[in-house]
């Protein structure tokens, strides 16, 4: 990553798409993480995720992700590419994405000779990368492993007390978790400020209105600008932001 790029604030990216949990009381918030809860109202088709061990000796692991099965019954927040919407069936087809993030203490203590588990270049399966060199830039809060992305390595940026992957365009390095068909909550809400960098958010409520708004612009709901929130396995909120 070029020095001038490293000095830029990493703005305009989605709020945490990592599938981590918290209380169901905050499930309606587009910027809060959510925890698993009760069963979904209807079954959802999915592709399976390869599970990974939560511990590995000598390897720094990313913060644990929720699985597709958990999303189908729980309350979560994640980046998604919405591919279709059916107002009559009150359901949406989408591809779920995540990115690797790490506890601050794990990255601060990482040294050459150790390893870090990561999804390189957005690969579906994670790999263990041996750390040959590590450079910490306190001014930019960026940690470059094996020369950073400019030299085929990895750059991690510290945000919200965690480190996450970052690309040249300041986005996280998204990888595909799998595909889901999820029902829409009858009180679903949509907040859309994607029309411009300073655009006011357009608020839409209810299954029919939200389905119509999403369906009218179906090719423009991607992992880079769209965050989906679920409550008890139903889509309860969609947030779309402007991206350059």
Residue map of PLM features:
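Bacterial lipoprotein signal-peptidase II cleavage site
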Residues: 9, 22-34, 38-43
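C-terminal motif of bacterial Sec signal peptides marking the signal peptidase cleavage site
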Residues: 17-21
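Bacterial N-terminal signal peptides that target proteins for export
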Residues: 2-10
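Solvent-exposed hydroxyl-ligand-binding patches built from regularly spaced Ser/Thr
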Residues: 49-244
């Amino acid at each position: 990553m070029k020095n001038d790029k490293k000095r830029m604030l990493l703005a305009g990216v989605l709020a945490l798409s990592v599938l981590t949990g918290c209380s169901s009381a905050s499930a309606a918030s587009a910027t809060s993480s959510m925890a698993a809860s009760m069963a979904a109202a209807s079954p959802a088709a999915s592709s399976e995720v390869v599970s990974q061990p939560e511990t590995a000796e000598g390897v720094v692991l990313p913060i644990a992700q929720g699985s597709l099965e958990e999303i189908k019954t729980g309350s979560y927040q994640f980046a998604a590419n919405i591919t279709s919407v059916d107002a009559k069936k009150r359901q949406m087809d989408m591809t779920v994405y995540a990115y690797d993030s790490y506890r601050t203490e794990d990255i601060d203590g990482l040294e050459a000779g150790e390893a870090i588990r990561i999804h390189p270049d957005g690969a579906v399966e994670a790999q263990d990368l041996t750390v040959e060199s590590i450079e910490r830039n306190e001014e930019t809060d960026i940690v470059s492993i094996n020369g950073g992305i400019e030299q085929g390595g990895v750059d991690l940026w510290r945000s919200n007390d965690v480190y996450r992957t970052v690309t040249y365009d300041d986005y996280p390095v998204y990888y595909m978790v799998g595909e889901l068909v999820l029902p829409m909550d009858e009180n679903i809400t949509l907040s859309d400020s994607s029309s411009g960098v300073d655009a006011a958010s357009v608020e839409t409520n209810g299954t029919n209105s939200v389905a119509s708004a999403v369906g009218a612009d179906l090719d423009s709901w991607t992992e880079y600008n769209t965050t989906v929130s679920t409550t008890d396995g139903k889509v309860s909120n969609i947030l779309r932001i402007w991206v350059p």
